[in-house]
């Protein structure tokens, strides 16, 4: 700063003694220096005696001043550096002295560049002249103001930023439109064509150039049905839009007022107020539309860290990290799935555990991505997220939800859901509760709603009345019993009664669907309205059975806006899908009948009870049947509109019998094996009727080849199709017409050739009762003469011998009559000397004979020799009813004489023999059937069906004489009971279950069911780890003892 005038006056007083001679001497010295044109160090020092005190700046700050000074001295660079102190004329004396010391140090460093032949002597006059420079002169007093002005001009640029705001405001005011500027006109156009009209006007301007006297066209996305045209006159606008489509030329063109012109293009930007635990949605990238939770905010860098459910394709990631080639095609967006670190390690993906230095939390780092607790922590820009009007659904919140210690879910961050709701949300009289702040959980009623504050009235004493609370700190409050209506969200329009309040979540019993609906308290209002809801969209109504485009099927349980909620036909678990109208293929209206577990017929509207599966114990009428799946309506079931999905074999008809033919167990063994039923007994030997095709047994078909009268033996049997397009399918025979058989498959009824079905048929309950089921009873049947009414003799008297016991061989080796078998042995028990039936009493070794090829004239039934109940003597598979039973308690000798008089196993009189201990079939023998048949063994899971009791599950622990010891419970840890075989049924295993093989070559082996292919199971056997394909009927669920 320049010194004040008072300081100058004091200096003038100190130097009044200086006479005029000194001034003259200085002038003479200057003339001498100019005359020499050279300079030593003394001349350099003298040359700096006089300079313009107000023309130079501080040389230490500005290098340009040094250059100016040096050029004014004839290019003497060294002199300019020696005279740096002369630029500090506006500093105090003390400051000058400090600078002078610094200058001396610089001079010492620059001596190498100065040629100095002389010696500098101290010059007292020079010192006086040096001090004299600071003395102002009267004639230069007026230059102080000029100096101050020049300094301000030079250094004012350093502070120009302080005045930018004021200057900007002025400039903005100057930019506002005035009456001299072009005007803005509103032109009406077709809705949705605003952008198209603007582009057409631009193209028209390009084509016609200056002839189109308009300045600009504006089409705003939020303003429908109008565009803005900037022009000087209305006539110019009319000329521009003349002949254009989508513009209503006959409509009046409106002039926008000048003060409103700026509002057309002004954008109201709201400051984003983000805090932790705020819910946001992603706008771009792989996670577009996904819900995210803010965990950190960096306001300086305008970035946030969010927590997302990962969308990571681990296979593609592993390929990328290994350097393998990745397909460049547009990849599908992976579904959201929590990150499994163990799965990533199995794919040899490198996983590093790192600690965040800011939060101290540990994260798993995979390829630069951070994961914690299965979530993906990602840092994104504020521009890539949406903050306004983010309302998560319950499904999304449950994925982010962490169960508390007591196992109940806590929807954390619910208060942040209400931060972006619309204004006018609360109305006078609404019951509210404070959700955060010092007054949290305070209840009250709304009195008045201001801009951002709500005035509430509370019953708590000592508080202001009314009390002003910020709108973001309030939430609506309801109590159980209130009738409400949903006004926003997924269930908008639904009405119901509040049955439970969980924090700020209401559970409502819907008036239409009678199911529980969860909604936010902020999304409902109290209402007495009861809505019936939409019951039909297009051709589909509520509770219709529909077929979807992916060939799945289900029942419509709810109608939403242009969509349906469909309960799919998956019996294992309830699966609900939201489908569009276009995704439904057709409506299924077929009337199909199926059979329950006990072979009772189930039709629509029949009441059934579920005895197995996740819906066990449910009961109700059948609404739909499709592919063996029942859709049952249970009015006590509050979910899924009351519908339950179950397999028909997991249900029983209410009021139906436990077995179709004989409740006492006459047909109970048909569940365990494919037993053949005996032929009907004729009234007399001559009363047998031949079918029209020459067949026997009152039927045609495979017995005679023609069409018979009466009931066919195939009716009601379960057969397997072995030829044709339906090869491998099984189902019951529902009709026989000549050589065609109608078989009911699970999907439909098909007609196949009679020769295309397998002989391995299973007897169903409504066929004849097996005569081999009673075991050792005395007598087997009540003694009657004859055994059946009006039947004398009981069997065909022309059959000699009457049974196969007089025939050698007794058993079948592919039924080859030329194969001698003495002693007779079963083809699968050749080496078992303990097998029954090897005694001569049963098979007196008669010579081999052609048993089926010598018909006796007049005989209506059997051939001679050796009558048979079975088929003709062609090679075939045959499951004998007399399978070997090597049990120690079955006596083989003595047996019963097989005389032609009667069958030994029937106690009829005359000719009958009592059966004690009996040689009939023991049902609890380890083997009770032919091939592909199932039987009981220890450590297998079974269903227990006792008369008058509900079905229980148990594990067979022991198989003894005629009974089974069963431990209740799926793991066999319950009570132990005794059960008859007719009361037990093997539970079929499912995929991945441990199984036990109960028949065939691998009988008794255990393994794992690794797959199911139709009626076959793929089993990995434990003993040799071989994989075998076995019939599911041979597999039982194994329970480890």
Swiss-Prot record:
The modification Phosphoserine is found at residue 59. Residues 122-133, 804-814 have a biased composition (Basic and acidic residues). Residues 1-133, 662-713, 768-921 are annotated as: Disordered. One of its GO terms (molecular function) is structural constituent of ribosome. May regulate transcription elongation by RNA polymerase II. May enhance transcriptional pausing at sites proximal to the promoter, which may in turn facilitate the assembly of an elongation competent RNA polymerase II complex. Belongs to the SPT5 family. This is Putative transcription elongation factor SPT5 homolog 1.
């Amino acid at each position: 700063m320049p010194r004040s005038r008072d300081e100058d006056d004091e200096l003038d007083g100190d130097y009044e003694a200086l006479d005029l001679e000194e001034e003259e001497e200085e002038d003479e010295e200057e003339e001498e220096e100019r005359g020499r044109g050279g300079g030593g160090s003394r001349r350099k020092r003298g040359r700096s005696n006089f300079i313009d005190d107000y023309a130079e700046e501080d040389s230490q700050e500005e290098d340009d001043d040094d250059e100016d000074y040096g050029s004014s001295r004839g290019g003497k660079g060294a002199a300019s550096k020696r005279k740096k102190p002369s630029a500090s004329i506006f500093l105090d004396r003390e400051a000058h002295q400090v600078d002078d010391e610094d200058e001396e140090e610089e001079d010492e460093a620059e001596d190498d560049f100065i040629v100095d032949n002389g010696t500098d002597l101290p010059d007292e006059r020079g010192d006086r002249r040096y001090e004299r420079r600071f003395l102002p002169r009267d004639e230069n007093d007026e230059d102080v103001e000029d100096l101050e002005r020049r300094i301000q001009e030079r250094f004012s640029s350093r502070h120009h930023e302080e005045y930018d705001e004021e200057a900007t405001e002025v400039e903005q005011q100057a930019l506002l439109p005035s009456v001299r500027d072009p005007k803005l006109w509103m032109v009406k156009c077709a809705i949705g064509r605003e952008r198209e009209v603007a582009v057409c006007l631009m193209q028209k301007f390009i084509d016609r150039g200056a002839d189109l006297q308009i300045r600009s066209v504006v089409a705003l996305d939020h303003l429908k049905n109008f565009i803005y045209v900037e022009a000087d006159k209305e006539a110019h606008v009319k000329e521009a839009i003349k002949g254009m489509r989508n513009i209503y030329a006959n409509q009046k063109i409106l002039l926008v007022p000048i003060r409103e012109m700026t509002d057309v293009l002004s954008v109201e930007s709201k400051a984003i107020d983000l805090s932790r635990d705020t819910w946001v949605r992603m706008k771009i990238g792989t996670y577009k539309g996904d819900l995210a939770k803010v965990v950190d905010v960096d306001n300086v860098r305008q970035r946030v860290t969010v927590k997302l459910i990962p969308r990571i394709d681990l296979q593609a990631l592993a390929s990328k990290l290994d350097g393998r080639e990745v397909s460049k095609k547009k990849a599908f967006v992976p579904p959201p799935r929590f990150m499994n670190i163990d799965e990533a390690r199995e794919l040899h993906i490198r996983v590093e555990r790192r600690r965040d230095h800011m939060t101290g939390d540990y994260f798993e780092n995979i390829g630069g991505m951070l994961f914690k607790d299965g979530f993906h922590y990602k840092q994104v820009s504020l521009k890539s997220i949406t903050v306004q009007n983010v309302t998560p659904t319950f499904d999304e919140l449950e994925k982010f939800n962490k169960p508390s210690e007591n196992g109940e879910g806590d929807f954390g961050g619910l208060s942040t859901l209400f931060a972006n709701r619309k204004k006018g949300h609360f109305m006078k009289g609404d019951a509210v509760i404070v959700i955060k702040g010092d007054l949290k959980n305070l209840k009250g009623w709304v009195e008045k709603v201001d801009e951002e504050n709500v005035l509430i009235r509370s019953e708590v004493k000592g508080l202001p009345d009314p009390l002003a609370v910020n709108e973001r700190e309030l939430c609506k409050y309801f109590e159980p019993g209130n009738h409400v209506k949903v006004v926003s969200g997924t269930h908008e329009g639904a009405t119901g009664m509040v049955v439970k309040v969980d924090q700020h979540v209401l559970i409502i019993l819907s008036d239409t669907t009678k199911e529980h609906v969860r909604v936010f308290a902020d999304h409902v209002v109290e209402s007495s309205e009861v809505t019936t809801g939409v019951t039909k969209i297009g051709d589909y109504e509520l509770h219709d059975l529909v077929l979807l485009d992916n060939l799945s099927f289900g029942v419509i349980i709810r109608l939403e806006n242009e969509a349906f909620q469909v309960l799919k036909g998956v019996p294992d678990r309830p699966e609900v899908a939201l489908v569009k109208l276009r995704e439904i293929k057709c409506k299924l209206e077929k009337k199909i009948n199926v059979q329950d577990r006990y072979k009772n017929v189930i039709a629509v509207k029949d009441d059934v009870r579920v005895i197995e599966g996740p819906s066990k114990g449910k009961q109700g009428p059948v609404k739909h049947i499709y592919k063996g799946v029942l859709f049952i309506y249970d009015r006590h079931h509050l979910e899924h509109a009351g519908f339950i999905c179950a397999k028909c074999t997991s249900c029983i008809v209410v009021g139906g019998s436990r077995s179709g033919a004989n409740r006492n167990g006459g047909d109970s063994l048909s569940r365990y094996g494919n037993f053949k039923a005996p032929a009907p007994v004729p009234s007399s030997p001559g009363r047998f009727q031949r079918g029209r095709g020459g067949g026997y047994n009152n039927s045609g078909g495979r017995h005679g080849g023609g069409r018979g009268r009466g009931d066919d033996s195939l009716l009601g049997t379960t057969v397997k199709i072995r030829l044709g397009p339906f090869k491998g399918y099984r189902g019951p025979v529902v009709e026989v017409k000549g050589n065609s058989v109608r078989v009911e498959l699970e999907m439909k009824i098909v007609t196949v050739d009679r020769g295309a079905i397998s002989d391995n048929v299973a007897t169903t309950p409504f066929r004849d009762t097996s005569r081999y089921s009673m075991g050792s009873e005395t007598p087997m049947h009540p003694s009657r003469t004859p055994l059946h009414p009006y039947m004398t003799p009981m069997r065909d008297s022309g059959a000699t011998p009457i049974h196969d016991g007089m025939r050698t061989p007794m058993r079948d080796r592919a039924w080859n009559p030329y194969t001698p078998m003495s002693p007779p042995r079963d083809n699968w028990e050749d080496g078992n000397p303990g097998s029954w039936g090897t005694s001569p009493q049963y098979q007196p070794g008669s010579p081999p004979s052609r048993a089926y090829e010598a018909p006796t004239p007049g005989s209506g039934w059997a051939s001679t020799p050796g009558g048979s109940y079975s088929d003709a003597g062609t090679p075939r598979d045959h499951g004998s009813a007399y399978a070997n039973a090597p049990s120690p308690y079955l006596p083989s000798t003595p047996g019963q004489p097989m005389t032609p008089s009667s069958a030994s196993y029937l106690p009829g009189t005359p000719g009958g023999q009592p059966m004690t201990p009996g040689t009939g079939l023991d049902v609890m023998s380890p083997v009770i059937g032919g091939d592909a048949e199932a039987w009981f063994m220890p450590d297998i899971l079974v269903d227990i069906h006792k008369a008058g009791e509900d079905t229980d599950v148990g594990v067979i622990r022991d198989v003894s004489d005629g009974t089974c010891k069963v431990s209740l419970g799926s793991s066999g840890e319950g009570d132990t009971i005794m059960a008859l075989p007719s009361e037990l049924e093997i539970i079929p295993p499912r995929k991945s279950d441990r199984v036990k093989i109960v028949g065939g070559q691998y009988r008794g082996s255990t393994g794992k069911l690794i797959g199911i292919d139709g009626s076959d199971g793929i089993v990995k056997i434990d003993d040799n780890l071989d994989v075998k394909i076995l019939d599911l009927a041979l597999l039982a669920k194994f329970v480890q003892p």
